[in-house]
Amino acid sequence: MLGTSLSPHHENFWAVIKSYYQLTKPRIIPLLLITTAASMWIASHGHIDPVKLLITLLGGTLAAASAQTLNCIYDQDIDFSMQRTRKRPIPSGRVQPRHALIFALILGSLSFSLLMVFVNLLSACLALSGIVFYMLVYTHWLKRHHVQNIVIGGAAGSIPPLVGWAAVTGQLDWSAWILFALIFLWTPPHFWALALMIKEDYAEVEVPMLPVVKGEKITVDQIWIYTLIVVPFSLLLVFPFQASGLFYAIAALVLGAIFIQKAWELKQNPFDQSLAKSMFKYSILYMMLLCTAMVVDSLPAVHDVTALVTTTLASLT
């Protein structure tokens, strides 16, 4: 079905594969998987089942790929209108929408089946809910109609840690929801920094992103506020929930201080594209390193070292 006859724009079978791969927006997926993995490590207290980890990450990859493909189908008119996205598979004519829809449904079905059979039903349902929420709530309802689109729609990108936690424990407790909320609060400063960089593109296709509707100054003020909330919120995993320990706390404080500095610099210069780009790139690095710190902190050896340091310091006071 996915042969070279699908489109005259494809020179060979590998070009077809490349087009379908591009439909999934693969650069977005790794960050979603990192949050899933971090959640699983915390939930398992560092004793992760490698097979379950790989299956869960594969299921998450398929779910995210399905959601992104559906997004490409729905937003094909916007993509065609913007110079930056005009060469994507659907607006360029390399993939037909009906074929992309079949591809997305196959990916979503594989994700749900894989998680349900080899992990558990809760993780499968959560992954499916992420696809549905991303398409119906964010892409269809919010993105083109509401200035707070990315705030509410950010819930879709916050579901992966719930999937990871459910995969390990079969349930969702407060620590899982803290991880969900952490990513939910991180999403606006991350995405609004990007929106500042491509404001004109969004304005051209009448997508009401915050910089388009309210301007740069209000946008950077909102970025500043959310950043100030995210950093202390990240420490809730340490106290009072005690899901993470000293190593994570130190990492969260250091990474958070840099995040706040980036937001402050942008607040002082709201029209500086280089600062918006720096903020956007660092927001990705921040979340990646924060999740890495969660994983390292959960390792038994790190717990032993932390306990030794704590005991030593206590004996000196």
Curated annotation (Swiss-Prot):
Reactions catalysed, semicolon-separated, are: heme b + (2E,6E)-farnesyl diphosphate + H2O = Fe(II)-heme o + diphosphate
Protein localization = Cell inner membrane
Pfam families found in the cross-reference section: UbiA
Topology of this chain in the membrane: Multi-pass membrane protein
- Any one of the GO CC terms: plasma membrane
In the UniProt record, does the keyword tRNA-binding occur?
A: no
Major localization class: membrane
Question: Which pathway is this protein engaged in?
Answer: Porphyrin-containing compound metabolism; heme O biosynthesis; heme O from protoheme: step 1/1
Biological processes per GO annotation: heme O biosynthetic process
Arranged from A to Z, the UniProt key words for this protein are: Cell inner membrane, Cell membrane, Heme biosynthesis, Membrane, Transferase, Transmembrane, Transmembrane helix
Please give the superkingdom of this protein's source: Bacteria
Output the InterPro entries linked to this UniProt entry: Protohaem_IX_farnesylTrfase (IPR006369), UbiA_prenyltransferase (IPR000537), UbiA_prenylTrfase_CS (IPR030470), UbiA_sf (IPR044878)
Under Enzyme Commission nomenclature, its number is 2.5.1.141
Kindly list the GO molecular function terms attached to this UniProt entry: protoheme IX farnesyltransferase activity
Query: Which top class of enzyme applies to this chain?
Result: transferase
NCBIfam families reported in the protein's UniProt record? cyoE_ctaB (TIGR01473), PRK04375.1-2 (NF003349)
List other remarks.
Carbon 2 of the heme B porphyrin ring is defined according to the Fischer nomenclature.
User: Which function does this protein serve?
Assistant: Converts heme B (protoheme IX) to heme O by substitution of the vinyl group on carbon 2 of heme B porphyrin ring with a hydroxyethyl farnesyl side group.
Family the entry assigns: Belongs to the UbiA prenyltransferase family. Protoheme IX farnesyltransferase subfamily.
Would you tell me the protein name for this molecule?
A: Protoheme IX farnesyltransferase
Species source reads: Picosynechococcus sp. (strain ATCC 27264 / PCC 7002 / PR-6)
